[in-house]
Design a protein with these regions (language model features):
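Short, low-complexity, Pro/Ser/Thr/Gly-rich segments in the mature regions of secreted, periplasmic
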Residues: 245-258
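Gly/Pro-enriched, hydrophobic low-complexity segments
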Residues: 80, 91, 101-105, 111-117, ...
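Positively charged n-region of N-terminal signal peptides that target proteins for export
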Residues: 1-4
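Short structured motifs
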Residues: 30-32, 46, 60-62, 140-145, ...
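Sec/Tat signal peptide C-region and signal peptidase I cleavage site
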Residues: 15-23
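N-terminal mature ectodomain segment of secretory-pathway/periplasmic proteins
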Residues: 24-108
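Ribonuclease/tRNase effector modules and their secretory precursors
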Residues: 49, 56-63, 67-69, 94-96, ...
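Bacterial N-terminal signal peptides
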Residues: 7-16
Length: 258
């Protein structure tokens, strides 16, 4: 009898969870996906190895800190290798609903360059990833529509509200129902032709957070690709606000140099 009651309770909970998932709107699904992909923990650090299909590589460290009380975030990227990008650093102040502030320090010129909002969808250090991929795209920049629901994933179409500001007509994202992590995004041009794809190749649970540890960006039109591998991932390490300032572009903190 007890077993029957327990089975009934488990079944009821499962049905309730399924019903709750079925009731999610496209906007809610995308918001959960954004939270899973960019807001794990209050802050974090990772070592990143980037491999381009032409044989080039990039090694860097990325730091992230959430601004308390909202969705604003700060990102700091410090390049360690190869020689042509060593000591280069990149800073983002992400402000959903507004243009992000982005700076790039070029050590060869001893120059801090402000990256214009219109350049956020350009190549990130010569790779197939874009500057916007580092910190994410604003939820309010697109209209979201649930195109399909499978047994394991939501498929959402995202259409830009300002088409003139981007190179795509729309993009489609596959989102895992359990983790809400995006597994794949495909970008289509005005002719409906696929020209770009970004996918999560490997996912591990780190400190309780499902985390992509390998991602791939493909320029389908040009036939090139870039793979990034994340290691030494740590969350909630007490990063200080002072790190995420223009001053530390020229003077990298020990959190990225060690």
């Amino acid at each position: 009898m007890r077993r029957s009651v327990m089975m009934a309770v488990v079944a009821a909970v499962s049905l309730a969870a399924a019903a709750q998932a079925a009731d999610l709107t496209a906007d809610e699904i995308v918001a959960k996906a954004n939270d899973a992909a960019y807001y794990a923990g209050n802050n974090g650090r990772a070592t990143v190895s980037m491999s381009l299909s032409d044989g080039r590589s990039r090694d860097f460290v990325i730091l992230r800190k959430d601004v308390q009380g909202g969705l604003d975030q700060k990102f700091y990227v410090y390049f360690k290798a190869p020689a042509d990008v060593r000591k280069m650093s990149y800073l983002v102040h992400k402000r959903p609903g507004k243009d992000d502030d982005r700076w790039l320090f070029l050590p060869a010129l001893n120059l801090v360059k402000r990256i214009a909002p219109g350049d956020k969808r350009t190549s990130f250090v010569g790779s197939d990833f874009l500057y916007e991929d580092v910190s994410g795209r604003g939820l309010d920049e697109d209209t979201h529509e649930l195109a399909e629901t499978t047994e394991t994933q939501y498929v959402v179409n995202n259409t830009p509200k300002n088409p003139a500001s981007v190179e795509f007509a729309y993009y489609r994202v596959w989102i895992d129902k359990d983790t809400f992590l995006p597994s794949k995004a495909e970008y289509l041009d005005k002719n409906g032709k696929l020209y770009r794809r970004v996918s999560s190749e490997k996912i591990q649970t780190i400190q309780g957070h499902p985390t992509p540890t390998e991602q791939k960006a493909e320029d389908v039109a040009r036939g090139t690709s870039t793979t990034i591998t994340f290691s030494e991932i740590k969350y909630d390490i007490g990063l200080k606000d002072r790190i995420f300032t223009e001053r530390f572009l020229r003077r990298p903190p020990r959190e990225v140099t060690q």
